[in-house]
């Protein structure tokens, strides 16, 4: 059974504050909106079997709007849930089922392919979620704890050098660097030997703390070309954003699939801008690492997605010994199909964790 872990606490009217009529109409409005993406009018609700006149339904919808649960976009007389309304629906009305057996087998088969690197497996998991959920799949890689085993600089020609760092756990990090033409094989070997002597056995985090001293030593002991290789290599492995982890995003094109109105295009453009803020997104997913189940953020509940009004559904993936490795999830419009996406995220996280054990 999927365990839900809500996002930050936001004050919304409780279910106890709504009578049976209001609860029923509210539920129908939200369900219709999540299905169609369109504002919902009173006639749509009345056709659904509610034994009330359209006028009575409109009055109830107006009451729900005054409570901050529904809103009316300026282009339509219909109503749609606010982010606060979606939060109340998810917490109080949503019925989460299970992933279909066919989809379970597909997820397991795609993640069980042999011969892939760790990062390739994570990217595949992100792609799986983006395809099944209809949003953008996201996954944060674990913090590396294995020591450095080997460092090598490989010439690629055209003024490019591939910096390769192999870890004791078998994982590999490659960084492409630009170098002036004419870098000699001896300079590449000299730089590799220098770093191997000093970084072998250290974690990447430990190696980063020593970078300043290593650069000073390189400038004193190596020729100018080899010293520059060491300096550029250490800078490349520093992670750019100062984090030992990386963020993998797949399926951004899905976010454009049903962007119809200009307002939706503007929202998607803002979401693309949000997704480019990787350090902030990793920080948000760090909160997910502490959750015991699926965590849901809706619109303005996060500062990062407050302008685009997007939702994040994510879960930690962990080993069989409950050691949290990272987080995986889906980002999309606030009208995501929560009942479908929540169990998909939960199941994919569990399969990914089992694969990491194997």
Curated annotation (Swiss-Prot):
The keyword Nucleotide-binding does not apply. Keywords: Repressor, Stress response, Transcription, Transcription regulation. GO terms for biological process: negative regulation of DNA-templated transcription. InterPro entries: GAF-like_dom_sf, HrcA, HrcA_C, WH-like_DNA-bd_sf, WH_DNA-bd_sf, WHTH_transcript_rep_HrcA_IDD. The keyword Transcription applies. Coiled coil: none annotated. PANTHER family: HEAT-INDUCIBLE TRANSCRIPTION REPRESSOR HRCA. Negative regulator of class I heat shock genes (grpE-dnaK-dnaJ and groELS operons). Prevents heat-shock induction of these operons. This is Heat-inducible transcription repressor HrcA. The gene is hrcA.
